[in-house]
Amino acid sequence: MTYTYDLTLGLPHTNHRFFAEQLMLKFAGHFQWQSIAAAAGLPLSSLRTADGSEVYASFYYIDTVIPAAAPLESFRLDDTVRFAIDLRAFKNIAFEGRVRFDRPERLNDATSPSIRFANIFITPEQGNSRLRVAPPAQADFHDLPPLPNEENPYHITRAASESGALGVLDEAWLQERTSTVTYAIDVDRDTNGAGLVYFANYVAFMDTAERRAVPKGRERSLRHRRIAYYGNAAVDDTLAIDVAVFRSGAHPDMLGFRYTIRRQEDGAIICLSEAVKALA
Protein backbone atom coordinates (compact mmCIF):
# COMPACT_ATOMS: atom_id res chain seq x y z
CA MET A 1 0.00 0.00 0.00
CA THR A 2 1.20 3.48 -0.85
CA TYR A 3 0.45 6.25 1.65
CA THR A 4 -0.09 9.63 -0.03
CA TYR A 5 -0.05 13.12 1.47
CA ASP A 6 -0.38 16.59 -0.04
CA LEU A 7 1.34 19.65 1.41
CA THR A 8 0.69 23.19 0.18
CA LEU A 9 3.74 25.27 0.94
CA GLY A 10 3.31 28.37 3.07
CA LEU A 11 5.63 30.52 5.12
CA PRO A 12 6.01 27.91 7.92
CA HIS A 13 7.25 25.36 5.36
CA THR A 14 9.88 27.57 3.73
CA ASN A 15 12.83 29.83 4.42
CA HIS A 16 15.08 32.05 2.29
CA ARG A 17 15.96 28.91 0.28
CA PHE A 18 12.25 28.09 -0.16
CA PHE A 19 11.60 24.35 0.52
CA ALA A 20 14.99 23.95 2.19
CA GLU A 21 16.34 20.50 3.03
CA GLN A 22 15.80 20.57 6.79
CA LEU A 23 12.24 21.84 6.33
CA MET A 24 11.49 19.25 3.66
CA LEU A 25 12.75 16.50 6.00
CA LYS A 26 10.55 17.72 8.85
CA PHE A 27 7.41 17.28 6.78
CA ALA A 28 8.53 14.15 4.93
CA GLY A 29 9.50 12.66 8.29
CA HIS A 30 6.11 13.56 9.74
CA PHE A 31 4.39 11.79 6.84
CA GLN A 32 6.65 8.78 7.41
CA TRP A 33 5.50 8.67 11.06
CA GLN A 34 1.87 9.03 9.99
CA SER A 35 2.31 6.09 7.63
CA ILE A 36 3.79 3.91 10.39
CA ALA A 37 0.89 4.91 12.65
CA ALA A 38 -1.62 4.03 9.93
CA ALA A 39 0.02 0.62 9.54
CA ALA A 40 -0.16 0.10 13.31
CA GLY A 41 -3.75 1.29 13.52
CA LEU A 42 -2.73 3.40 16.52
CA PRO A 43 -1.24 6.85 17.12
CA LEU A 44 2.50 6.46 17.64
CA SER A 45 2.25 8.52 20.84
CA SER A 46 0.15 5.73 22.40
CA LEU A 47 2.70 2.96 21.84
CA ARG A 48 4.41 1.52 24.92
CA THR A 49 6.91 -1.22 25.74
CA ALA A 50 5.87 -4.27 27.75
CA ASP A 51 6.91 -2.44 30.94
CA GLY A 52 4.94 0.69 30.02
CA SER A 53 7.80 2.88 28.80
CA GLU A 54 7.19 5.31 25.94
CA VAL A 55 8.62 4.41 22.55
CA TYR A 56 9.63 6.65 19.65
CA ALA A 57 10.21 5.76 15.99
CA SER A 58 13.68 7.27 15.71
CA PHE A 59 15.37 7.85 12.35
CA TYR A 60 18.68 6.03 11.97
CA TYR A 61 19.34 6.41 8.22
CA ILE A 62 18.31 8.80 5.45
CA ASP A 63 19.30 8.74 1.77
CA THR A 64 18.03 11.74 -0.20
CA VAL A 65 18.40 12.14 -3.97
CA ILE A 66 17.39 15.43 -5.58
CA PRO A 67 17.55 15.45 -9.41
CA ALA A 68 18.73 18.60 -11.17
CA ALA A 69 15.33 18.75 -12.88
CA ALA A 70 13.54 19.25 -9.54
CA PRO A 71 15.83 21.06 -7.06
CA LEU A 72 14.40 21.77 -3.62
CA GLU A 73 14.56 25.51 -4.16
CA SER A 74 12.21 25.15 -7.16
CA PHE A 75 9.32 24.39 -4.78
CA ARG A 76 7.89 27.79 -3.87
CA LEU A 77 5.10 29.38 -1.84
CA ASP A 78 1.62 28.03 -2.66
CA ASP A 79 3.02 25.06 -4.58
CA THR A 80 1.41 21.74 -3.68
CA VAL A 81 3.87 18.93 -3.05
CA ARG A 82 2.65 15.33 -3.01
CA PHE A 83 4.49 12.69 -0.97
CA ALA A 84 4.04 8.97 -1.73
CA ILE A 85 5.42 6.50 0.83
CA ASP A 86 5.86 2.73 0.66
CA LEU A 87 6.81 0.94 3.90
CA ARG A 88 8.53 -2.33 4.73
CA ALA A 89 8.93 -3.70 8.26
CA PHE A 90 11.77 -5.58 9.94
CA LYS A 91 10.69 -7.79 12.86
CA ASN A 92 8.06 -5.37 14.17
CA ILE A 93 10.78 -3.00 15.34
CA ALA A 94 12.31 -1.23 12.33
CA PHE A 95 10.94 0.26 9.12
CA GLU A 96 12.10 1.37 5.73
CA GLY A 97 10.15 4.09 3.94
CA ARG A 98 10.65 4.67 0.21
CA VAL A 99 9.43 8.20 -0.47
CA ARG A 100 8.90 10.10 -3.69
CA PHE A 101 7.72 13.69 -3.73
CA ASP A 102 6.97 16.26 -6.40
CA ARG A 103 4.18 18.37 -7.79
CA PRO A 104 1.17 16.06 -8.18
CA GLU A 105 1.21 16.17 -11.98
CA ARG A 106 4.88 15.09 -12.04
CA LEU A 107 5.05 12.59 -9.21
CA ASN A 108 5.26 9.52 -11.43
CA ASP A 109 8.07 11.07 -13.42
CA ALA A 110 11.42 9.33 -12.99
CA THR A 111 12.97 12.72 -12.22
CA SER A 112 11.04 13.19 -8.96
CA PRO A 113 13.10 13.61 -5.77
CA SER A 114 13.31 10.54 -3.54
CA ILE A 115 14.14 9.65 0.06
CA ARG A 116 14.93 6.37 1.73
CA PHE A 117 14.05 6.56 5.42
CA ALA A 118 14.88 4.01 8.12
CA ASN A 119 13.34 4.11 11.61
CA ILE A 120 13.67 1.98 14.71
CA PHE A 121 11.64 2.04 17.92
CA ILE A 122 13.66 3.32 20.87
CA THR A 123 13.06 4.48 24.43
CA PRO A 124 15.24 6.89 26.44
CA GLU A 125 16.96 4.93 29.19
CA GLN A 126 19.04 7.61 30.93
CA GLY A 127 17.99 10.81 29.20
CA ASN A 128 18.64 11.58 25.56
CA SER A 129 22.21 10.27 25.70
CA ARG A 130 21.15 6.67 26.39
CA LEU A 131 18.60 5.28 23.95
CA ARG A 132 17.58 1.63 23.98
CA VAL A 133 15.91 -0.36 21.19
CA ALA A 134 12.40 -1.05 22.44
CA PRO A 135 9.66 -2.84 20.48
CA PRO A 136 6.11 -1.68 21.21
CA ALA A 137 3.96 -4.29 22.94
CA GLN A 138 0.58 -3.52 21.38
CA ALA A 139 1.37 -2.91 17.69
CA ASP A 140 1.56 -5.50 14.93
CA PHE A 141 2.98 -4.67 11.52
CA HIS A 142 2.56 -8.08 9.89
CA ASP A 143 0.46 -6.57 7.09
CA LEU A 144 3.46 -4.60 5.82
CA PRO A 145 5.84 -6.20 3.32
CA PRO A 146 8.90 -7.60 5.12
CA LEU A 147 12.27 -5.87 4.95
CA PRO A 148 14.90 -8.61 4.42
CA ASN A 149 17.81 -8.40 6.82
CA GLU A 150 20.33 -8.03 4.00
CA GLU A 151 18.46 -4.90 2.78
CA ASN A 152 18.24 -3.29 6.22
CA PRO A 153 20.04 0.10 6.17
CA TYR A 154 21.43 -0.80 9.59
CA HIS A 155 24.27 -2.54 7.76
CA ILE A 156 25.13 0.73 5.99
CA THR A 157 25.23 2.68 9.24
CA ARG A 158 27.31 0.02 10.99
CA ALA A 159 29.88 -0.03 8.16
CA ALA A 160 30.02 3.77 8.19
CA SER A 161 30.70 3.79 11.94
CA GLU A 162 33.88 1.82 11.21
CA SER A 163 35.01 3.54 7.99
CA GLY A 164 33.70 7.06 8.57
CA ALA A 165 32.31 7.07 5.01
CA LEU A 166 28.82 6.59 3.59
CA GLY A 167 29.62 6.00 -0.08
CA VAL A 168 28.38 9.26 -1.57
CA LEU A 169 31.95 10.43 -2.18
CA ASP A 170 34.25 8.04 -4.05
CA GLU A 171 38.03 8.19 -4.53
CA ALA A 172 37.66 10.84 -7.27
CA TRP A 173 36.69 13.37 -4.61
CA LEU A 174 39.79 14.97 -3.06
CA GLN A 175 39.70 16.67 0.31
CA GLU A 176 40.38 20.40 0.08
CA ARG A 177 39.97 21.70 3.63
CA THR A 178 38.35 21.01 7.00
CA SER A 179 36.63 23.08 9.64
CA THR A 180 35.03 22.55 13.06
CA VAL A 181 32.12 24.52 14.46
CA THR A 182 30.60 24.26 17.93
CA TYR A 183 26.87 24.66 18.44
CA ALA A 184 25.00 25.01 21.74
CA ILE A 185 21.67 23.19 21.50
CA ASP A 186 18.69 25.53 21.78
CA VAL A 187 16.07 23.67 23.83
CA ASP A 188 13.18 25.70 22.39
CA ARG A 189 14.20 25.54 18.75
CA ASP A 190 16.00 22.20 18.39
CA THR A 191 13.82 19.70 20.26
CA ASN A 192 10.61 17.86 19.39
CA GLY A 193 7.59 16.70 21.38
CA ALA A 194 9.45 13.59 22.52
CA GLY A 195 12.07 15.79 24.18
CA LEU A 196 14.80 14.69 21.74
CA VAL A 197 16.97 16.84 19.49
CA TYR A 198 14.94 16.70 16.28
CA PHE A 199 16.44 14.59 13.50
CA ALA A 200 15.89 17.20 10.76
CA ASN A 201 17.72 19.86 12.74
CA TYR A 202 20.96 17.90 12.36
CA VAL A 203 20.89 19.09 8.73
CA ALA A 204 20.65 22.70 9.92
CA PHE A 205 23.65 22.11 12.21
CA MET A 206 25.63 20.71 9.27
CA ASP A 207 24.61 23.58 7.00
CA THR A 208 25.84 26.06 9.62
CA ALA A 209 29.23 24.34 9.74
CA GLU A 210 29.32 24.17 5.94
CA ARG A 211 28.79 27.92 5.60
CA ARG A 212 31.76 28.51 7.90
CA ALA A 213 33.93 26.13 5.87
CA VAL A 214 33.14 27.50 2.40
CA PRO A 215 33.71 31.17 1.59
CA LYS A 216 30.60 33.01 0.53
CA GLY A 217 30.07 32.62 -3.18
CA ARG A 218 27.81 30.62 -5.48
CA GLU A 219 24.67 29.09 -4.02
CA ARG A 220 24.75 25.35 -3.38
CA SER A 221 21.89 23.02 -4.30
CA LEU A 222 21.61 19.52 -2.83
CA ARG A 223 21.85 16.59 -5.22
CA HIS A 224 22.56 13.67 -2.88
CA ARG A 225 22.90 13.20 0.87
CA ARG A 226 23.17 10.23 3.20
CA ILE A 227 22.85 10.53 6.96
CA ALA A 228 23.57 7.89 9.62
CA TYR A 229 22.32 8.61 13.14
CA TYR A 230 24.00 6.99 16.15
CA GLY A 231 22.49 8.83 19.09
CA ASN A 232 21.00 11.99 20.50
CA ALA A 233 22.13 14.63 22.96
CA ALA A 234 21.00 16.29 26.16
CA VAL A 235 19.12 19.50 25.50
CA ASP A 236 21.75 21.53 27.38
CA ASP A 237 24.72 19.95 25.57
CA THR A 238 27.01 21.49 22.96
CA LEU A 239 27.80 19.83 19.63
CA ALA A 240 31.04 19.84 17.65
CA ILE A 241 30.44 19.61 13.90
CA ASP A 242 33.44 18.69 11.75
CA VAL A 243 33.06 19.33 8.02
CA ALA A 244 35.49 18.37 5.26
CA VAL A 245 35.15 19.95 1.82
CA PHE A 246 35.91 17.91 -1.33
CA ARG A 247 36.32 18.68 -5.02
CA SER A 248 36.34 16.37 -8.03
CA GLY A 249 37.81 17.10 -11.45
CA ALA A 250 35.00 15.04 -12.92
CA HIS A 251 32.41 17.36 -11.32
CA PRO A 252 33.85 20.90 -11.49
CA ASP A 253 30.48 22.51 -10.77
CA MET A 254 29.89 20.53 -7.58
CA LEU A 255 31.25 20.35 -4.04
CA GLY A 256 31.35 17.31 -1.77
CA PHE A 257 31.03 17.39 2.01
CA ARG A 258 31.65 14.93 4.83
CA TYR A 259 30.31 15.78 8.27
CA THR A 260 30.81 14.34 11.75
CA ILE A 261 28.72 15.49 14.72
CA ARG A 262 29.92 14.80 18.27
CA ARG A 263 28.28 15.67 21.55
CA GLN A 264 30.41 17.44 24.14
CA GLU A 265 29.11 15.37 27.06
CA ASP A 266 31.24 12.33 26.23
CA GLY A 267 32.71 12.98 22.80
CA ALA A 268 30.50 10.32 21.21
CA ILE A 269 29.74 10.53 17.49
CA ILE A 270 25.98 10.92 17.09
CA CYS A 271 25.80 11.52 13.33
CA LEU A 272 27.76 11.01 10.11
CA SER A 273 26.78 12.44 6.74
CA GLU A 274 28.04 12.90 3.20
CA ALA A 275 26.57 15.20 0.58
CA VAL A 276 27.12 16.41 -2.96
CA LYS A 277 25.84 19.86 -3.89
CA ALA A 278 25.70 21.60 -7.25
CA LEU A 279 27.05 25.13 -7.53
CA ALA A 280 24.35 27.40 -8.90
Task: Please annotate each region the language model reported.
Residues 169-179, 184-242, 246-258, 269:
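Acidic/His-leaning functional-site neighborhoods
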Residues 40, 44, 97-103, 131-133, ...:
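Generic preference for flexible, low-structure residues
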Residues 15-17, 24-25, 30, 61, ...:
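A generic structural micro-environment signature
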Residues 1-30, 93, 112-113, 118-194, ...:
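Non-catalytic linker/capping segments at the edges of enzyme domains
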Residues 1-84, 90, 206-210, 214-219, ...:
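Hydrophobic, proline/glycine-rich low-complexity stretches
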